[in-house]
């Protein structure tokens, strides 16, 4: 299944807007966690070829899914919620619901930048130092053969 091309800037703008509205009700640690991850997203936009930037943004998005669940479940006001408060809580919940989809798009971008999740990568193109294979230069002559040692 081919994912549609979604610009990273659109993902950032959407989550920034939803996080800003979510901060109407949930401030403090909710704001710090989400805006810090959005700063990593800005870094990923600024450095288009960086695998580190996009992988840290992806990891941060995954972490904020868990953190948002904790923040919303602990700090959701049970009584006296105004219309503005309901709107802010709804936007925070909408941001939480959209984060897994955003993670899929960001993971796709991570793979496009050359990222690979796993411990073993293909290293068949590399030659080990103690390899006994012939040198790459066909005209290279091993030491002591074909050349006279000249002393001064």
Curated annotation (Swiss-Prot):
Keywords attached to this entry: Cytoplasmic vesicle, Endoplasmic reticulum, Golgi apparatus, Membrane, Phosphoprotein, Transmembrane, Transmembrane helix
Domain of life: Eukaryota
GO-annotated cellular components: cytoplasmic vesicle membrane; endoplasmic reticulum membrane; Golgi membrane; plasma membrane
Keyword Endoplasmic reticulum (UniProt): yes
Localization in the cell: Endoplasmic reticulum membrane; Golgi apparatus membrane; Cytoplasmic vesicle membrane
Positions in the Extracellular compartment: 1-23, 77-86
A Pfam entry, by short name: AGTRAP
InterPro entries on file: AGTRAP
Assembly behavior: Interacts with RACK1, and with the carboxy-terminal region of AGTR1.
The protein, known as: Type-1 angiotensin II receptor-associated protein
């Amino acid at each position: 299944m081919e994912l549609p091309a979604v610009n990273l800037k659109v993902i950032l703008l959407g989550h920034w807007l939803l996080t800003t509205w979510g901060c109407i009700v949930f401030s403090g640690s909710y704001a710090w966690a989400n805006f810090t991850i959005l700063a990593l997203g800005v870094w990923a936009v600024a450095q288009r070829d960086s695998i580190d930037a996009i992988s840290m943004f992806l990891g941060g998005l995954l972490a904020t899914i868990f953190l948002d669940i904790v923040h919303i479940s602990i700090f959701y006001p049970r009584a006296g919620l105004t219309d503005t408060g309901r709107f802010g809580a709804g936007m925070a919940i909408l941001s939480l619901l959209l984060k897994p989809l955003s993670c899929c798009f960001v993971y796709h971008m991570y793979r496009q930048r050359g990222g690979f999740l796993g411990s073993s990568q293909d290293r068949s193109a590399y030659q080990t130092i103690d390899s006994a294979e012939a040198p790459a230069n066909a005209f290279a002559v091993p030491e002591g053969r074909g050349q006279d040692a000249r002393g001064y």
